[in-house]
C-alpha cells in the first residue's frame, strides 16, 4: 500500500532539492489552496459518478439486468470484505481499516472515502500533476504535457510483477502496460484539464482522482461483489468519449501553449 506513495515522495524530494524547505512548504500548501472555482470542484466530484449513472441507465434501457438499490443493503459488509482481500499487506494497515469499517456504517463510509482520497488522490496527484505536469507544461501545449505524464503514469502502474515477467520472458505481461495505457489516457487529459483551471491548487485534481477511484471500485467491487455492474472496458470507453468531448469544448486551454515563467492562471 505504501508503495503507492512513490510519486508523492519523489515530488517532495525533488522539490526539497530545488527549493529547500520553503519550496516543500509551498508545495504542500497547494494541496489545500481554495483558489479554484466552483466548476473545477463540480467536475472533480461529480463527473465520474455521472458517467457511471449514465452507463447504468443505458444498460437498463438496453435490457441489461441492473441490480436494485435493495442489493446495497450489505454495502458495509462488502467494504469490509473488499479490505480483507488486501490482508496480505505486511503493515497490517488494511486489517486495521477492515476492523474499523466493521464497527458501523459511519466508520465504513469514512474508511472508504478516506482510502479513496489517500490512495490515488494524495499518493499520486502531487507527483504526476503537481510536479511532473507543472514542469512539463511551460513551453508546451497542455495536452502534450498531459500525454508525456500519461506515458510515465501508465508504466509506473505496471509494478514489479510486470518487470519480473519481462526478465523471465513471460510475454503475457505485455498486456499489463497496454491496459494501463488505455485506462490512464483519458484520465491524464481530464486531470490536466481540471488542474490548469484550478489556479495552482492541487485540491480539485486530488478530489477528481478520489472520486474516480470511489466510483470505479463501487461499481466493480462493492455494489455486487464478484459481479461488476459495469465492466472496466465499458467504463474506459465512456471516459475516452468524455475526454474527446472535453477536448472539443476545452481546446482553447488544452491546445494553448503556456509561456515559460507564466503564472498559475489557465491559458
What are these model-predicted stretches?
Residues 123-150, 196-201:
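Membrane-interface helix/loop boundary segments of multi-pass membrane proteins
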Residues 76-98, 127-134, 161-172:
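Membrane-interface interhelical connector segments
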Residues 52, 142-161:
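Small-polar-interrupted transmembrane alpha-helices in polytopic inner-membrane proteins
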Residues 5, 45-46, 113-118, 147-154, ...:
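Residue-level signature of the transmembrane alpha-helical core
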Residues 1-121, 149, 196, 217-267:
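Specific transmembrane helices
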Residues 54, 132, 187-191:
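Hydrophobic/aromatic residues in alpha-helical transmembrane segments
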